[in-house]
């Protein structure tokens, strides 16, 4: 049986990246919540832009 998690960086960025979060009101709420909590890494995009948690 095939496993459910088949990793792909492209799909990961497209679904959970910064631009995708900014595209919807709820996505912006997610970012605001993560900023308020003091998260070092807001989205998966940050991993590729030098933040690396």
UniProtKB/Swiss-Prot annotation:
Q: Gene of origin? A: rpmH
Instruction: Point to the regions of Basic residues compositional bias.
Output: 1-16, 32-42
Give the residue ranges for region: Disordered. Answer: 1-20, 32-53
UniProt-listed PROSITE patterns: RIBOSOMAL_L34
At the top level, the lineage of the source is: Bacteria
Biological process (GO) annotations held by this record are: translation
| Keyword terms | Ribonucleoprotein, Ribosomal protein
Q: What family does the Swiss-Prot or TrEMBL record give for this protein?
A: Belongs to the bacterial ribosomal protein bL34 family.
Q: Which GO terms describe its molecular function?
A: structural constituent of ribosome
Q: Name one GO cellular component term.
A: ribonucleoprotein complex
* Gene3D superfamilies listed in its UniProt record: 1.10.287.3980
Official protein name in the record: Large ribosomal subunit protein bL34
What's one Pfam family here? Ribosomal_L34
Q: Which organism is this protein's natural source?
A: Bacteroides fragilis (strain ATCC 25285 / DSM 2151 / CCUG 4856 / JCM 11019 / LMG 10263 / NCTC 9343 / Onslow / VPI 2553 / EN-2)
């Amino acid at each position: 049986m095939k496993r459910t998690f088949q990793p792909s960086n492209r799909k990961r960025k497209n679904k959970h990246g910064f631009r995708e979060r900014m595209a919807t009101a709820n996505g912006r709420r997610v970012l605001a919540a993560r900023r308020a909590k003091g998260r070092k890494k807001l989205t998966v995009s940050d991993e590729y832009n030098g933040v690396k948690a």
